[in-house]
């Protein structure tokens, strides 16, 4: 590998919405905020969870006249 052309590889923190904190390394120097991780993803937990970012589910239901389940 050529010397001096590669970005620095630094430690960052990825924080999930469930509170799980993951330390990893990346060339991106800012910390990440995750919506789902291995601790709260429905595939791994077996529980269904609706992740609504900005009312998109309600907007979809309203557009297609689908009654709300709440």
Swiss-Prot record:
It comes from Haemophilus ducreyi (strain 35000HP / ATCC 700724). Its cofactor is Zn(2+). GO terms for biological process: translation. InterPro entries: Ribosomal_bL28/bL31-like_sf (IPR034704), Ribosomal_bL31 (IPR002150), Ribosomal_bL31_A (IPR027491), Ribosomal_bL31_sf (IPR042105). Binds the 23S rRNA. PROSITE patterns: RIBOSOMAL_L31 (PS01143). This is Large ribosomal subunit protein bL31. Zn(2+) binds at residues 16, 18, 37, 40. Belongs to the bacterial ribosomal protein bL31 family. Type A subfamily.
């Amino acid at each position: 590998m050529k010397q001096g052309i590669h970005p620095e590889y630094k430690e960052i923190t990825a924080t999930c919405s469930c509170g799980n904190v993951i330390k990893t390394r990346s060339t991106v120097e800012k910390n990440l905020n995750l919506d789902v991780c291995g601790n709260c993803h429905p595939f791994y937990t077996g529980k269904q969870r609706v992740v609504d970012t900005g009312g998109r589910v309600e907007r979809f239901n309203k557009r297609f006249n689908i009654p709300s389940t709440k």
